[in-house]
Amino acid sequence: MKKRKTVKKRYVIALVIVIAGLITLWRILNAPVPTYQTLIVRPGDLQQSVLATGKLDALRKVDVGAQVSGQLKTLSVAIGDKVKKDQLLGVIDPEQAENQIKEVEATLMELRAQRQQAEAELKLARVTYSRQQRLAQTKAVSQQDLDTAATEMAVKQAQIGTIDAQIKRNQASLDTAKTNLDYTRIVAPMAGEVTQITTLQGQTVIAAQQAPNILTLADMSAMLVKAQVSEADVIHLKPGQKAWFTVLGDPLTRYEGQIKDVLPTPEKVNDAIFYYARFEVPNPNGLLRLDMTAQVHIQLTDVKNVLTIPLSALGDPVGDNRYKVKLLRNGETREREVTIGARNDTDVEIVKGLEAGDEVVIGEAKPGAAQ
């Protein structure tokens, strides 16, 4: 009886083991097969760019000021007017400059008359001195009279020299007065558009220490872009790199140029440091305007016809620019070591390790998993 119970117990244990094995086998056979997100490796182009926000300004902008003091009698332009080089923009009351010219001219006339008188007196002094010399030979006059005549002649000669110096000084004053009269006419130093008027007609300007600004001219045929670049990106920039931008009102049109320079002085914005990279673009149609916001792209690298894969396909690093990559072949995955080159925010160049047509794993998902 005891032996039967032992045999029965063994059968039960064996049955449990078999059932457990069958359940395990069923689970293995019915386990969901992993599915992979893959990409076929193909040649393509890879660009690496720095993104920045910029502002537009005119390439050439000039503050037109007054070089003489006085009331702005007329202002012939308004904001937005287009002007030509040497076009009359305004006039400062010329009365003071005209009166100064008249005053200096009158002084010059007086000095020239004095010079004529001094020349006549010098001529008389020379005649007197010659006569005194002849009389002195006959002892008809004393040596003192002869010396007096010589002194008188020298004094008259010196008077002419003094008058000549005064004439030169006043001639210079006359030239300055005429120049000041010319300065009362404010003309455009270049062709451009009036973008700002600082002094209104009727206001008085004082040019005692520095030229007061009347208006601002901008040449809008070419624009200067100032791109605000972070300190992390600025180390990659250098003159000559390609740059392009779009504006908010026309995101489909690209305006292209080359980096001109990177200003050395940074700007601090909310504890972040930024530098300004500048480049020029033509504006023949006048569509670009002052202070427009530009979405700037500065191209760091541009490689053509190279093998690229997404950054998400890179596995663990195994050395300098070397990574593991999973390949899918005949439903099975294999790891392969690759060497990378240029990269951007989404893709990377494969220098070695893959061929066109290889299928790389970029992700893995199981059926029923949330996508």
From Swiss-Prot:
GO biological process: one example: xenobiotic detoxification by transmembrane export across the plasma membrane
Keywords: Antibiotic resistance, Cell inner membrane, Cell membrane, Coiled coil, Membrane, Transmembrane, Transmembrane helix, Transport
Coiled coil region boundaries: 92-137
Location in the cell: Cell inner membrane
Main location per the UniProt record: membrane
Periplasmic side: 32-371
SUPFAM superfamilies the UniProt entry points to: HlyD-like secretion proteins
GO cellular component terms, semicolon-separated: efflux pump complex; extrinsic component of membrane; MacAB-TolC complex; membrane; plasma membrane
Membrane listed as a keyword: yes
Induction: Expressed at very low levels under standard laboratory conditions.
Membrane topology classification: Single-pass membrane protein
Molecular function (Gene Ontology), one example: efflux transmembrane transporter activity
UniProt family annotation: Belongs to the membrane fusion protein (MFP) (TC 8.A.1) family.
Subunit structure: Homohexamer. Part of the tripartite efflux system MacAB-TolC, which is composed of an inner membrane transporter, MacB, a periplasmic membrane fusion protein, MacA, and an outer membrane component, TolC. The complex forms a large protein conduit and can translocate molecules across both the inner and outer membranes. MacA interacts with MacB and TolC, and this interaction changes its conformation.
Domain notes: The periplasmic domain is sufficient to bind MacB. The membrane proximal (MP) region plays a critical role in the stimulation of MacB ATPase activity.
Function (record text): Part of the tripartite efflux system MacAB-TolC. MacA stimulates the ATPase activity of MacB by promoting the closed ATP-bound state of MacB, increases the capacity of MacB to bind macrolides such as erythromycin, and provides a physical link between MacB and TolC. When overexpressed, the system confers resistance against macrolides composed of 14- and 15-membered lactones but no or weak resistance against 16-membered ones. In addition, MacA binds tightly rough-core lipopolysaccharide (R-LPS), suggesting that the system could also transport R-LPS or a similar glycolipid.
Protein name: Macrolide export protein MacA
Organism of provenance: Escherichia coli (strain K12)
Lineage: Bacteria, Pseudomonadati, Pseudomonadota, Gammaproteobacteria, Enterobacterales
Gene that encodes the chain: macA
